[in-house]
Amino acid sequence: MEQSRQNLQSQFFIEHILQILPHRYPMLLVDRIIELQANQKIVAYKNITFNEDVFNGHFPNKPIFPGVLIVEGMAQSGGFLAFTSLWGFDPEIAKTKIVYFMTIDKVKFRIPVTPGDRLEYHLEVLKHKGMIWQVGGTAQVDGKVVAEAELKAMIAERE
């Protein structure tokens, strides 16, 4: 197991993400992971398109991607980081685990996210003990911070 974490690849495509995260359409909010350093940090992104169902109501004639979904995307990225830091890329173990949100702190929304944006999640491990992980970071578009947050989650057995 230690060997798999040391040799963990740094980029993951959607077919890999689907093997680790339990989320599915319309709630999977990570398209690709472009950097991952076990126990340290992750950079991932979601491409925001006008075809997102959420834009039917948020808001007609002024589409803005909801802040709560930005935070959820950050949480999913953090969950991927926590899982792969503990078990490497292991789809069989992923079938037996689930990551639960525990707290959201220091959330700030700075700039609206709109169709055509590439929403990047930049998260670092703040601390972890056993199955409890705390991550913090930003969501960015074109290098500008659009949101920031600290998140705490717990990895548990799936029932």
UniProtKB/Swiss-Prot annotation:
Query: CDD domains attached here?
Result: FabZ
Instruction: Give UniProt keywords alphabetically.
Output: Cytoplasm, Lipid A biosynthesis, Lipid biosynthesis, Lipid metabolism, Lyase
Q: Which reaction does it catalyse?
A: a (3R)-hydroxyacyl-[ACP] = a (2E)-enoyl-[ACP] + H2O
Q: Where in the cell is it found?
A: Cytoplasm
Q: Name one GO molecular function term.
A: (3R)-hydroxyacyl-[acyl-carrier-protein] dehydratase activity
Give the main location: cytoplasm
Q: Keyword RNA-binding: yes or no? A: no
The active site lies at: H58
Annotated GO biological processes are: fatty acid biosynthetic process; lipid A biosynthetic process
Taxonomically, which superkingdom?
Answer: Bacteria
One GO location term (cellular component) = cytoplasm
Q: What Enzyme Commission number does this protein have?
A: 4.2.1.59
> Which InterPro entries does the protein's record reference?
FabA_FabZ (IPR013114), FabZ (IPR010084), HotDog_dom_sf (IPR029069)
Chain's role: Involved in unsaturated fatty acids biosynthesis. Catalyzes the dehydration of short chain beta-hydroxyacyl-ACPs and long chain saturated and unsaturated beta-hydroxyacyl-ACPs.
List, alphabetically, the PANTHER family matched: 3-HYDROXYACYL-[ACYL-CARRIER-PROTEIN] DEHYDRATASE
Query: Which family is this protein grouped under?
Result: Belongs to the thioester dehydratase family. FabZ subfamily.
Protein name per its UniProtKB record:
3-hydroxyacyl-[acyl-carrier-protein] dehydratase FabZ
